[in-house]
Regions:
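Short, well-structured N-terminal submotif of metal-dependent ribonuclease cores
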Residues: 1-39, 51-65, 129
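Short catalytic/ligand-binding loop motif for oxyanion handling, primarily in non-cytosolic enzymes
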Residues: 46, 132-133
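Active-site phosphate/pyrophosphate-handling residues
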Residues: 7-8, 46, 110-114
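Active-site neighborhoods of divalent-metal-dependent phosphate/nucleic-acid chemistry enzymes
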Residues: 73-127, 133
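Active-site-proximal, substrate-binding regions of enzyme catalytic domains
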Residues: 24, 42-44, 48, 52-92, ...
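Active-site regions of enzymes building and remodeling cell-envelope glycoconjugates
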Residues: 136-143
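Short glycine-/acidic-enriched loop or helix-start segments at secondary-structure transitions
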Residues: 13, 134-136
């Protein structure tokens, strides 16, 4: 099962045409290969922040249609996921650009990774190169 980072969902639902096509094409290939997808409640929250406002009804409907897709599970965040996110932030860093002291993963990224691991996902799909070398789950950067 592939856990989808919020940016992948945003690309798939309303990304610029090139990013949207990349996301939809890659997800279609994965689905044809028999893979299923998961998102967390946090992913839903991140995706919906910019859509709550005047005149955003269609955008909101588009996201909810995606969230209720037949090949997608939504995971509630658990205490175990929060504990693992704390451990990720405490134990893991990524190289800073330009080179400086390594940086700790942000809370949202740590929660996304923790949710994917705790739920038993095989891969975390993102477009964030800073997550690519995280060691506890396979991280795939959108091609």
């Amino acid at each position: 099962m592939y856990d989808l980072d919020a940016v992948i969902v945003i690309y798939a639902v309303e990304g610029n045409p090139a990013d949207q096509q990349r996301a939809l094409d890659h997800m279609a290939v994965l689905e044809q290969a028999g893979h299923r997808f998961a998102i967390s409640d946090l992913t839903c929250t991140e995706c919906l922040v910019p859509v709550f406002g005047p005149g955003s009804g269609q955008r909101l409907s588009d996201f909810f249609r995606f969230f209720h897709g037949p090949n997608l599970r939504t995971l509630g965040l658990t205490a175990a996921m929060h504990a693992r996110a704390s451990a990720i932030r405490g134990r893991h860093t990524y190289p800073a650009v330009p080179p400086a002291q390594p940086k700790r993963y942000g809370l949202a990224d740590a929660l996304h990774l923790a949710a994917a691991i705790e739920f038993g996902c095989d891969v975390f799909l993102t477009n964030d190169n800073q997550l690519a070398n995280f060691p506890d789950i396979t991280v795939e950067v959108l091609p």
